[in-house]
Amino acid sequence: MSLDAADITVKLGRTPILHGIGFCAKPGEVSAIVGPNGSGKTTLLRAITGDLPFDGTVRLNGKDTSRMKPWELSAIRAVLPQSAVLAFPFTVAEVVRLGVQAGVCARDCDAPMAALSQVRLAHYADRFYHELSGGEQQRVQLARVLAQVWRPVVGGAPRWLLLDEPVASLDIANQLEVMEITRAYASAGGGVVAVMHDLNLTAMFADHLAILSGGQCLAAGPPEQVMTDAILSQAYGCALRVNTPPPHSATYVLPHAANRL
């Protein structure tokens, strides 16, 4: 039971975007996809979710996703896009309930309010979604996908959170909270795949990561093995040093030292 993507190739028109990438994620782990802008992170995730045409194969819990019906997929995996635009004035509770409807699981009818409570927005349930800040909207969308696959394991099979930059517009406290939610989901037996830009948060929370560069996978493995000076410098095109404080006693703030109040 895992998520296995093999030889993923994506072209936009005649332009190759991904070049035969392989990617594997296991339940019980947080798997991250990192890399510079334009490296193919979101494209890889959208290929995995079936939102882009691609060559190659994606297997989820042993099944070829190209042979699965939409309702079968929505019952075992929930997708958080980078952004979501709603054309109608839904309340926060209505947005989150969309997740339960997509998940096709009536037994999770209490999941929407539980998910809103988990992201600390239960008191916003009756507010209109469009009235919220960008960061609050992102947390509502996270609650929606949590509600869709609320129980991390069903019938002995893991369920999956597929998240595209889940902390991009959040402050540090909410970033930590969201990543702790993903860690708890994985610890309960579910699988998490997240596209990330913040390397510090990735190092803190990811069990496994793939580093993309130029549409190829430059390295994959545990953070302590692949987050090296050489690999990161090659991927990002600038000299980077791991576990090195800034020179000349410069002020710096790391999430590693934070404790949420």
Curated annotation (Swiss-Prot):
GO terms for molecular function: ATP binding; ATP hydrolysis activity. ATP binds at G35, P36, N37, G38, S39, G40, K41, T42. SUPFAM superfamilies: P-loop containing nucleoside triphosphate hydrolases. Residues 3-239 form the ABC transporter domain. GO terms for cellular component: plasma membrane. It is a peripheral membrane protein. SMART domains: AAA. Pfam families: ABC_tran. Signal peptide: none annotated. CDD domains: ABC_Iron-Siderophores_B12_Hemin. Its EC number is 7.6.2.-. It is found in: Cell inner membrane. The keyword Nucleus does not apply. NCBIfam families: PRK13548.1. Part of the ABC transporter complex HmuTUV involved in hemin import. Responsible for energy coupling to the transport system. The complex is composed of two ATP-binding proteins (HmuV), two transmembrane proteins (HmuU) and a solute-binding protein (HmuT). Belongs to the ABC transporter superfamily. Heme (hemin) importer (TC 3.A.1.14.5) family. This is Hemin import ATP-binding protein HmuV. It comes from Roseobacter denitrificans (strain ATCC 33942 / OCh 114). The lineage of its organism: Bacteria, Pseudomonadati, Pseudomonadota, Alphaproteobacteria, Rhodobacterales. The gene is hmuV.
